[in-house]
Design a protein with these regions (language model features):
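Metallo-beta-lactamase
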Residues: 8-103
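Structural motif
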Residues: 5, 27, 155-157
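Alpha-helix-centered segments that form part of catalytic cores
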Residues: 1-9
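Short coil/turn residues that cap or connect secondary-structure elements
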Residues: 6, 70, 108-112
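Short, well-ordered beta-strand micro-motif
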Residues: 3, 23-25, 163
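C-terminal regulatory/interaction regions
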Residues: 103-164
Length: 164
């Protein structure tokens, strides 16, 4: 519980975008400060380097928890306009990442064993996001590895390569 502007807000730890991300909920007014956790028109960046063993899995869990919160009438994101359907948007973001995981599996069929950068170039063809794209690609590949759906090895140059 956090007192803010004379109101009591429930603090919801929502790791994924960052390991220490929180959201705030005021059930009396129905306001939910979603920060960078749930955004209305883009998906939050999921970084692969974190003290969390699987940031993407943590993000999925956090999205599920947020989707279960009752009495949310208005979500207030850190980027974009306020929106109403928090549960629906959280589910939509999860579906986006499930599609991204499928896309990685399809890319692996074409590439074979490849490093993070090779996967990133195929995932983010339409726009270069640099380090953010590479770390998010890494988060997805590591998620697959930790789920037992990929293997990671070091190549001759010492680069981490993935087999799916």
């Amino acid at each position: 519980m956090l007192k803010l502007a004379g109101r009591e807000w429930f603090v919801q730890h929502t790791p994924g975008h960052t390991a220490d991300h929180i959201c705030l909920h005021d059930p009396e007014t129905g306001a939910f400060m979603s920060g960078d956790h749930v955004l209305p028109s883009i998906t939050p960046h999921i970084g692969g380097v974190s003290y969390l063993s699987d940031p993407l899995k943590s993000f999925f869990y956090s999205l599920d928890r947020v989707g279960e919160i009752r009495d949310v009438d208005l979500a207030l994101p850190a980027h974009g306009h306020p929106f109403n359907d928090l549960k629906g948007r959280a589910q939509s973001i999860k579906e986006h990442h499930f599609e991204r995981l499928d896309e990685i599996r399809n890319i692996a069929n074409d590439l074979g064993r490849a490093d993070v950068n090779a996967f990133m170039k195929r995932l983010f063809r339409e726009r270069s996001w640099g380090d953010m794209a590479e770390s998010e690609t890494y988060a997805h590949l590591e998620h697959l590895r930790l789920e037992g759906k990929a293997e990671a090895h070091r190549n001759e140059e010492g680069r981490l390569v993935y087999d799916l």
